[in-house]
């Protein structure tokens, strides 16, 4: 297959991934409830703000859907490469990255979306679910036993997983079947770019944390 065709195919998949990532379930749900999550609480169109304003159950559903956006896009690329192209043509890392970009800057919602934490988790699972499990444990330990500030916990947890991405066999094991067909170093490289995106999306949270004004999470079990 000519190189320019491969480039065009990847660009098409990346565009589709961005548009898919731009589907924001937090906004869709809040619109269904005749509201706009971006006008409530922190103004963030993510599962944490949904938790504060609509309850635990729907927040967990949206969190799962945001994870699945990236993971399913990566899985689709894996099967397209396997059965349609019979070769590693579409770079799943780039597709996953574009899903995260779409989640943070959704074209369907005036480029104001979520912070990208859940969609980042979807990428991590695509590389190796072991890293995701370790990340979940770190996250829970921090938020339960140290600080109940979601943004702080996210900004600590996501970068802390980077060293694991640099372990070659993490993306070469059967559990990393989506990533194994690519050189191991691509996963940490793309992950660095995702970390930078997530940090930027939290710039307002960082400012509030410096001022001591960032909200502490409250576990509300009831839905509004």
Curated annotation (Swiss-Prot):
Belongs to the PlsY family. Probably interacts with PlsX. It comes from Mycoplasmopsis pulmonis (strain UAB CTIP). Pathway: Lipid metabolism; phospholipid metabolism. The keyword Transmembrane applies. Its main location: membrane. The keyword Acetylation does not apply. Its EC number is 2.3.1.275. GO terms for biological process: phospholipid biosynthetic process. One of its GO terms (molecular function) is acyl-phosphate glycerol-3-phosphate acyltransferase activity. It is a multi-pass membrane protein. It catalyses: an acyl phosphate + sn-glycerol 3-phosphate = a 1-acyl-sn-glycero-3-phosphate + phosphate. It holds the Pfam family G3P_acyltransf. It is found in: Cell membrane. It is an enzyme of class 2 (transferase). The chain crosses the membrane at residues 4-24, 60-80, 88-108, 124-144, 149-169, 182-202. Catalyzes the transfer of an acyl group from acyl-phosphate (acyl-PO(4)) to glycerol-3-phosphate (G3P) to form lysophosphatidic acid (LPA). This enzyme utilizes acyl-phosphate as fatty acyl donor, but not acyl-CoA or acyl-ACP. Keywords: Cell membrane, Lipid biosynthesis, Lipid metabolism, Membrane, Phospholipid biosynthesis, Phospholipid metabolism, Transferase, Transmembrane, Transmembrane helix. One of its GO terms (cellular component) is plasma membrane. HAMAP family: PlsY. This is Glycerol-3-phosphate acyltransferase.
């Amino acid at each position: 297959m000519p190189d320019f065709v491969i480039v065009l195919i990847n660009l098409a998949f990346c565009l589709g991934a961005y548009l898919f990532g731009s589907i924001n379930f937090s906004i869709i749900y809040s619109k269904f409830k005749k509201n706009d999550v971006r006008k409530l609480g922190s103004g963030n169109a993510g599962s944490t703000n949904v938790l504060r304003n609509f309850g635990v159950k729907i927040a967990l559903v949206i969190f799962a859907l945001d994870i699945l956006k990236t993971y399913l896009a990566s899985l689709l690329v894996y099967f397209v490469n396997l059965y349609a192209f019979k070769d590693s043509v579409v770079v799943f890392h780039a597709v996953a990255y574009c899903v995260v970009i779409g989640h943070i800057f959704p074209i369907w919602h005036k480029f104001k979306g979520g912070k990208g934490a859940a969609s980042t988790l979807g990428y991590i699972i695509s590389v190796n679910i072991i890293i995701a499990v370790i990340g979940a444990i770190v996250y829970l330990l921090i938020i339960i036993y140290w600080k109940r500030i979601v943004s702080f916990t996210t900004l600590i947890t996501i970068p802390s997983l980077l060293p694991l991405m640099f372990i070659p066999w993490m993306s070469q094991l059967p559990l990393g079947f989506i990533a194994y067909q690519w050189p191991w170093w691509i996963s940490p490289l793309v992950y660095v770019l995702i970390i930078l995106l997530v940090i930027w999306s939290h710039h307002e949270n960082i400012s509030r944390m410096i001022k001591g004004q960032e909200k502490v999470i409250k576990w509300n079990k009831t839905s509004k």
